[in-house]
């Protein structure tokens, strides 16, 4: 009887704990937020074309060498991913916006979701046609701040700093999928 009571008590306690599935759902939701939170710390950092490493901002690269040290759009995203997850998208060949967006999910290691399902911390992409078969058609990436209209990004040399922008007023439509970091 004593063992039966102890077993019953353990069964009740175990049923009160969150399931593994619940824990994973919570964990998945926090990785993107943690990546966004890290990227937010770069507020005001200069834009540098080709700038960014796992260690932080770096000098701009040819053909645009203005002497700036900072991030470009994909450098900012890859730096934040590296800082939070330890994954180095720079050395995996996923640093460039189009290679990240066009990679299949197996190589990417993250899942793509329709734009309408965006969440904070998802990578959002821009590029006219968003055609993976056309060079240069995908040329900007940012991180969603919310599931609405706000993104965090390193827009370009004209703006010259990491900042918040509206996706609806960015100048071109967003690509049909976002990447969710989990």
Model-derived features with residue positions:
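Fungal secretory targeting signals
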Residues: 1-20
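N-terminal capping segments
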Residues: 17-87, 136-137
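...with weaker cross-activation on analogous glycine-rich loops/strands in unrelated enzymes
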Residues: 24-33, 86-165, 182
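Sequence contexts marking disulfide-bonded cysteines in secreted/extracellular proteins
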Residues: 53-55, 103, 131-133, 174-176
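Catalytic cores and adjacent binding grooves of peptidoglycan-active enzymes
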Residues: 168
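Low-complexity, Gly/Ser/Thr/Pro-rich intrinsically disordered linker/tail segments
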Residues: 172-182
